[in-house]
Amino acid sequence: MESRVLFSSQFNFPVNSPFKTRETSIAPLTPSRNVLSFSFRSPAERCAMRIVPLVKAASSTPQIVAEVDGSSHEPRRKKLAVFVSGGGSNFRKIHEGCSDGSVNGDVVLLVTNKKDCGGAEYARSNGIPVLVFPKAKREPSDGLSPSELVDVLRKYGVDFVLLAGYLKLIPVELVQAFPKRILNIHPALLPAFGGKGLYGIKVHKAVLESGARYSGPTIHFVNEEYDTGRILAQSAVRVIANDTPEELAKRVLHEEHKLYVEVVGAICEERIKWREDGVPLIQNKQNPDEYY
C-alpha cells in the first residue's frame, strides 16, 4: 500500500500533528486541534501525514515572505519551458494538466539534449517548439549555447523552467537568469540517493540496496549542483520487502505524475512562499493560512 505526503524542507519522521502559520504573523506555529493521536496510526498512515518543519520559540520563528505583488487579481497564465532527455512522461502529464485546467499555465517550449527522444516527438505532435541544448559535439549547429538558451527563454517570456527527466547539468547562466524559477523532480527522497550519476533505475537499485523502508519523488528548486537545491515537496512510497528496482520505479513514477502536476499548479497560482530562513512552502489553496 502506498502513502502520499507533501513535505516542505527536508524529509523528516512524522510528528503528531500538522502545523500551520500565518503569512502576516511571527507567532509560533500552532498544532491543529482535530488531529488523531500519532500513536494510533500505522507506519504508512504516520508517513502520510502532512507536516511542515517544527519551529521553536516565537523570538526565533522565521516569517513567511510572499514573493508576489500583493494584488488581489487572479494570477495570469504562466509560460512554462520543460526540459527532457527521454520519453517525457512527466512532461506529458504537465501538458495534460495545462489542457484540463489543473495548471494555470501553458508549455511554450520543450528543451532536450536528444532531439529524437519521445518527449520531443510528443512536443512536435502537439505544436510545441523543440530546442536542442547543449550543442551536440558531432552536430554543434543543432544546439544552443547557454547564453543563446537564456535569450530564447526570455524571448518566449518563460516564467518557470521545469526539468522532467533532463540528465544534463543546468548551466550557471540559466540558474542566475531564473532564480527560484527552476524546478526538478528526482525519483528518491532527497537528500538521500541524489547527485551526479544517480538517475533512473540506478536510484531505485541504490534505495533497495540500502534497506530504506520508504522512497518516493522529490521536487526541488535547482541550483548549480545536482539535486542540492531547496526541497519543495516529496511523496512517500513504501518499499515492499520483495521489491525489484523496476517495480519500485513504477510505483514512484506513478506518484511523480501526480505530485509534479500538483506542485506546478501551485507555482502557477503563486502559492509558493518563502520563509526568512530560505525554506519554500506551499500555501493551501482552500485554507490560505495553512502551509505545507
UniProtKB/Swiss-Prot annotation:
Pathway: Purine metabolism; IMP biosynthesis via de novo pathway; N(2)-formyl-N(1)-(5-phospho-D-ribosyl)glycinamide from N(1)-(5-phospho-D-ribosyl)glycinamide (10-formyl THF route): step 1/1. GO terms for biological process: 'de novo' IMP biosynthetic process. The record marks D227 as: Raises pKa of active site His. SUPFAM superfamilies: Formyltransferase. Its main location: plastid. The keyword Glycoprotein does not apply. Pfam families: Formyl_trans_N. GO terms for cellular component: chloroplast. Its EC number is 2.1.2.2. It is found in: Plastid, Chloroplast. (6R)-10-formyltetrahydrofolate binds at L167, K168, L169, I170, N184, D227. PANTHER family: PHOSPHORIBOSYLGLYCINAMIDE FORMYLTRANSFERASE (PTHR43369:SF2). Belongs to the GART family. HAMAP family: PurN (MF_01930). This is Phosphoribosylglycinamide formyltransferase, chloroplastic. The gene is PUR3.
